[in-house]
């Protein structure tokens, strides 16, 4: 069993973006390829949770397993994706990553996983005053909490955090690198993110 594993969430419909965000161009590759390059440099095992519509093109791009949600919970948002990844890879801790934050650095995973300890269920960053539960790490024991929520048809990450002993991290090394956590949800944000990158 790995101590640490990674789960990339690429199951959303990307309705605001207008096309699958996982396949959007970024620095000569795609969002999903860039994120996986960063994650696999730090983590022993990584799995991509994909929407069925893009599973095949994603598989052609990446060298890690690409799976869909557990059938019974398909379409139940990020909780379904996270628990599907937890079932696929056995690990103590799971670093979660959405497919629409392409600016992430391998340094982030070193910081995040360095904050894990057995007394916590989750480690979650606070960026510009906002909790970021999809850029976080979760202990294996959280799996049962997720199943319980899904059985009650609850899908909220906030509801999950309310049931966990969470270590929130908001130190200078996180705040000074807020651009690591930028989510690209619209074409306007995509254009701005590319401009910001070219200005660095």
UniProtKB/Swiss-Prot annotation:
Gene3D superfamilies: Spore Coat Polysaccharide Biosynthesis Protein SpsA, Chain A. It comes from the Bacteria. GO terms for cellular component: cytoplasm. GO terms for biological process: Mo-molybdopterin cofactor biosynthetic process. The keyword Nucleotide-binding applies. Keywords: Cytoplasm, GTP-binding, Magnesium, Metal-binding, Molybdenum cofactor biosynthesis, Nucleotide-binding, Transferase. It catalyses: Mo-molybdopterin + GTP + H(+) = Mo-molybdopterin guanine dinucleotide + diphosphate. Its main location: cytoplasm. It is found in: Cytoplasm. GO terms for molecular function: GTP binding; metal ion binding; molybdenum cofactor guanylyltransferase activity. Its cofactor is Mg(2+). Transmembrane segments: none annotated. InterPro entries: MobA-like_NTP_Trfase, Molybde_CF_guanTrfase, Nucleotide-diphossugar_trans. Mg(2+) binds at residue 100. GTP binds at residues 9-11, 21, 69, 100. Its EC number is 2.7.7.77. The N-terminal domain determines nucleotide recognition and specific binding, while the C-terminal domain determines the specific binding to the target protein. Belongs to the MobA family. Transfers a GMP moiety from GTP to Mo-molybdopterin (Mo-MPT) cofactor (Moco or molybdenum cofactor) to form Mo-molybdopterin guanine dinucleotide (Mo-MGD) cofactor. This is Probable molybdenum cofactor guanylyltransferase. It comes from Bacillus cereus (strain ZK / E33L).
